[in-house]
């Protein structure tokens, strides 16, 4: 579960290393985001020469959460860290590589480009 002020690792090669969640998109009273949900975030740490800089406000999709999430078949999925992928125009990822596994929920939320770039879909 991701909410305001949550810090997330960045799972792509845009140059950002850490994000701070500003807002969960999808309704005025929406408090939490899970795998496949879009958030607005600020870049808190970035490497020099990357496509995003520290302080940039970006949209990102959550790809891993520490809090377990229940699936329709009754199983649960959880990861060791909270991570997100920065989005560019539309729902396409800004980077060209994705690092680490991503949840299968991204396929249901129509993030097919991220699913195809990811080394493993769990």
Curated annotation (Swiss-Prot):
Source domain of life: Bacteria
GO terms classed as biological process: translation
GO molecular function terms listed in the Swiss-Prot or TrEMBL record: large ribosomal subunit rRNA binding; structural constituent of ribosome
Matches recorded under Pfam families: Ribosomal_L14 (PF00238)
InterPro entries for the chain: Ribosomal_uL14, Ribosomal_uL14_bac-type, Ribosomal_uL14_CS, Ribosomal_uL14_sf
Function: Binds to 23S rRNA. Forms part of two intersubunit bridges in the 70S ribosome.
Family label: Belongs to the universal ribosomal protein uL14 family.
Gene Ontology CC annotation, any one: cytosolic large ribosomal subunit
Protein name: Large ribosomal subunit protein uL14
Gene behind the chain: rplN
Species per Swiss-Prot/TrEMBL record: Bifidobacterium longum (strain NCC 2705)
Assigned keywords, A-Z: Ribonucleoprotein, Ribosomal protein, RNA-binding, rRNA-binding
Subunit structure: Part of the 50S ribosomal subunit. Forms a cluster with proteins L3 and L19. In the 70S ribosome, L14 and L19 interact and together make contacts with the 16S rRNA in bridges B5 and B8.
Family matches, as NCBIfam families: rplN_bact (TIGR01067)
